[in-house]
């Protein structure tokens, strides 16, 4: 694709194209990071990006930059093809969709698929090899079910969903529109519910539902448990990374982002736009307000207020955590000084 064609596409996008220079209008085959890009590749820079200095000697064919004078001057001096955009990262995402259009599997049901009784399959769907669909389940129109997926009984999958190889939807799972479930993820698995008795643990039946609202994406190997009663609900547009555990009865607001190895215990509540970085742990019935952020390895108990940024275990306001962190390495010397003061102080 010529850079000029890409510019025409970006003009229709939402990244805010402001200006561009075609230079020699290079033919672009793919995208790459600026430090590795070749003459037939596209890259981008954001304000404050650590790779900014690479622009002076990168071999990139064309680059997407923010409205930043120093970057524009470098691009012009080097004769690079470039575009100035309000949001270069978003533009790069839109460009990659043009450079790497995804192929859709052919519609139809593979002969090795096992389809239960009273299953409804919408128009234009693609069912891959060795898929199993349980009795009474419904798969919406234009959905893609890749090989090896197992869909239990009484599952509802809305329109235009994509279930990648070996994903599992257990009984009572409900998916809205345009959801993506990646390989080896399990939606609707039984919650960790047991009742202590004199004879050991008695299993609590997990009869509830798991609901993924529209546009939810679930990463590889992640699990979302169903509760004993009621539902576990993942808000629209929420993105879940690989290897995330979401316990029974958890409810998230819209547009949350949960990074790898996050663990959320049963009954926790997340507001809209919450961001949990890698390995964050959320305790049973904790409440996290809208647009709160937890940095990596934070341990959240109780309540986090809306818009707050927390760190550490137990999680405390980020600024306080940074101050505490700065003292950790000094603790041995401080303890030594304290012992000396104690010895030298008259009793």
From Swiss-Prot:
HAMAP family: LpxD
Protein name: UDP-3-O-acylglucosamine N-acyltransferase
PANTHER family (alphabetical): UDP-3-O-ACYLGLUCOSAMINE N-ACYLTRANSFERASE, UDP-3-O-ACYLGLUCOSAMINE N-ACYLTRANSFERASE 1, MITOCHONDRIAL-RELATED
Pathway noted in the entry: Bacterial outer membrane biogenesis; LPS lipid A biosynthesis
Family: Belongs to the transferase hexapeptide repeat family. LpxD subfamily.
Subunit-structure text: Homotrimer.
UniProt GO molecular function: N-acyltransferase activity; structural constituent of carboxysome shell
Keywords of this entry: Acyltransferase, Lipid A biosynthesis, Lipid biosynthesis, Lipid metabolism, Repeat, Transferase
EC number: 2.3.1.191
Active site feature: 248 (proton acceptor)
Reactions that this protein is recorded to catalyse: a UDP-3-O-[(3R)-3-hydroxyacyl]-alpha-D-glucosamine + a (3R)-hydroxyacyl-[ACP] = a UDP-2-N,3-O-bis[(3R)-3-hydroxyacyl]-alpha-D-glucosamine + holo-[ACP] + H(+)
NAD recorded as keyword: no
Described purpose of this protein according to its UniProt entry: Catalyzes the N-acylation of UDP-3-O-acylglucosamine using 3-hydroxyacyl-ACP as the acyl donor. Is involved in the biosynthesis of lipid A, a phosphorylated glycolipid that anchors the lipopolysaccharide to the outer membrane of the cell.
Organism name: Prochlorococcus marinus (strain MIT 9313)
One Gene Ontology biological process: lipid A biosynthetic process
Superkingdom, taxonomy of origin: Bacteria
GO cellular component: carboxysome; membrane
Gene3D superfamilies named in the record: Hexapeptide repeat proteins, MurE/MurF, N-terminal domain
């Amino acid at each position: 694709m010529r850079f000029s064609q890409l510019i025409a596409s970006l003009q229709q996008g939402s990244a805010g194209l402001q200006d561009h220079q075609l230079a020699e209008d290079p033919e672009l085959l793919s995208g790459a990071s600026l430090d590795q890009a070749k003459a037939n590749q596209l890259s981008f820079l954001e304000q404050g990006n650590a790779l900014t200095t690479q622009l002076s000697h990168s071999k990139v064919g064309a680059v997407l930059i923010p409205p930043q004078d120093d970057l524009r001057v470098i691009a012009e001096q080097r004769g690079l093809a470039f575009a100035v955009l309000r949001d270069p990262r978003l533009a790069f995402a839109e460009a990659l969709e043009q450079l790497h259009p995804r192929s859709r599997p052919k519609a139809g049901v593979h002969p090795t698929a096992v389809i239960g009784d009273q299953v409804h399959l919408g128009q234009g769907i693609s069912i891959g090899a060795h898929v199993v669909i349980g009795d009474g389940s419904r798969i919406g129109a234009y959905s893609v079910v890749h090989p090896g997926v197992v869909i239990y009984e009484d599952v509802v999958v809305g329109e235009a969903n994509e279930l990648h190889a070996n994903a599992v939807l257990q009984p009572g799972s409900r998916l809205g529109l345009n959801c993506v479930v990646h390989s080896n993820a399990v939606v609707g698995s039984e919650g960790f519910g047991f009742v202590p008795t004199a004879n050991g643990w008695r299993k609590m039946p997990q009869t509830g539902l798991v609901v993924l609202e529209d546009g939810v994406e679930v990463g590889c190997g992640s699990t979302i448990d169903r509760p004993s009663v009621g539902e576990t609900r993942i808000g629209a547009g929420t993105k879940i990374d690989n290897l995330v555990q979401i316990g029974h009865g958890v409810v998230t607001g819209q547009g949350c982002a949960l990074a790898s190895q996050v663990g959320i215990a049963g009954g926790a509540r997340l507001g809209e736009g919450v961001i949990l970085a890698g390995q964050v742990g959320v305790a049973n019935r904790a409440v996290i307000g809208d647009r709160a952020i937890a940095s990596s390895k934070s341990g959240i108990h109780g309540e986090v207020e809306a818009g707050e940024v927390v760190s550490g275990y137990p999680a405390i306001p980020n600024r306080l955590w940074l101050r505490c962190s700065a003292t950790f390495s000094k603790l041995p010397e401080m303890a030594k000084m304290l012992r000396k003061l104690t010895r030298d102080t008259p009793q």
